[in-house]
Every structure is written in C-alpha cells, then in structure tokens.
C-alpha cells in the first residue's frame, strides 16, 4: 500500500501513565517539536484523540480538544496551518472515548455528557477537515459494571440509548461530511463480533473501525472479520499486541493495564503477534481505499515507536 494511504495516531503519546512528564506534554512546544519528527518518519497525516479533560485542567497545551486548539492557535484553521508548516498535511480522523463520563450511578449523566462532548468533537472533526470521527460505543465494561452492578440486566436498555445517541451523531456527521465509524475495542459492551448487531441497528452511513489488536484479544481473527465485513468498514487501525486475555482482563475497571499481570496490552506496531503485513496485503487485494491508521498506543517511548512504526511501514510498502 502506498505510504500516503497511512496516518499515525497521536495516541502514541500516553498522557496518563508515562514519559514525557506532564509539564512537557501540557506545553505547546512539545507537540510542535513532535510534528516534524512524525513527518520525518514518513507520515504526512495524523489522527487526533479528542479529550475534553484538557479544558478543565488549567492549561491548554495538549491540542486534543476545541478549547485548547482555539486557545493556542485561534481556531482550527490556525492549527492546521501550524501542522502544515511542520510537515503534517492533514488530519485524517478524530477519536472519542466516553470513559471520562462513566463516573457515577447516574446513567443519564453518562449519556448526556457523552452526547454533548461527542457532538462537540464531531464538529471539531469537521473543522479539522477530517475524513472520519471514530467513537467508542461504550465505556470500559468493568468501569460501567462498577457504577452499575445491574449492567447485564440493563444491557437492552443501555443498547437502546446507545443506538439513539449514535443515530443522532450519524445524522450530524452526514450533514458535516464526516464519516462516523464505531471503534471495536476488546473491553467494551460491544466487543468483538458483538458490535455487528449494534451496527445493524444504525443507519447505513455508519461504518466499522477495525482495530486489529482488539479483535485478536477478543478471540476474533482480524483477517476473517475484515473479509466478512469489508462493505461496512470505514477505517482500519493497525494495532499490535501479544496479549492473551485468559483471565477476563476485559471485565476489569482498567483493562488497558492488567491488574493481575505485569504487562501491557498493546505493543508498538510490528513488535507483537498480529499479522499486520498480511492484513495490509488483504486490504490491498480487496481494493480497500479507506483510511488506515497506525497506532502505537500505550508505547513506553513515543520516539522509539516512531522508528519502529517506520520500519513496519517499509515492510508494508514492499
């Protein structure tokens, strides 16, 4: 696949558990020094997580929401110009995770806050000229279960409210010219193939965001899943892992960091057991022309991860 088909996600900088320390990554200079390194690694396109939390912390250096972008650059156009000056030609996608709002027993709060900020993030995606807006359709299963012990009994009602929220976003996305795609994560209520009934209940404009590592951890072969659902795929995240979830880590409150093992879930692309070259070849063979994003999520060293991802990119182009 040609290099211009690939983007890299800024989730390679872990804002919660590791270096760079908070004083660095909450500063504008850190990101403006990072963009040329991304471009030098061969990427002219990026994906940006949308994280409302940064507008509540007193600083605005993390460019992961509308408030921070407007504070530092005036507006989205100003930020896009700053990216272009540093070798980043476009933002292919914005991602949104509602976990921040699963924080109490009030389910109305969760859906209300998630809907409000997802709508804000979707509008920001349009302002950034993004191709897609990738939303996690549920919070962590274990986090939701902690605040809602009757979650399984309420699954049908939870799903119905999720369909309502996503249907509203789908209509807005269509008006804005942005594709709404559902993230497929191993820790959610709609993990693995459980996302397919949810997708079937939504408008045809809503597509799948295939996360290769999450599928493998959930016990689903990524290649088989892609082959069976190619017509509904709107984005592919090439993520890597060597993690085997043999003790139901997906049901814990923080499934990205297993509480019963000293390990991590994700690996830098090309260092795990997911057949990423095979999946890239499969996508090319079926004529897939949609967004493909490489993610070094949870990496211990973002700068080393850039080099490792570039090494994988060299394989994917051969």
Residues of each region from the PLM?
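Active-site beta-loop-alpha junctions enriched in small/polar residues
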Residues: 11-15, 51, 95-99, 138-140, ...
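Active-site groove signature of glycoside hydrolases
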Residues: 125-151, 176-185, 293
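N-terminal pre-domain/capping segments
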Residues: 1-128, 156, 164-167, 174, ...
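Active-site cleft segment of glycoside hydrolase catalytic domains centered on the general acid/base Glu
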Residues: 143-166
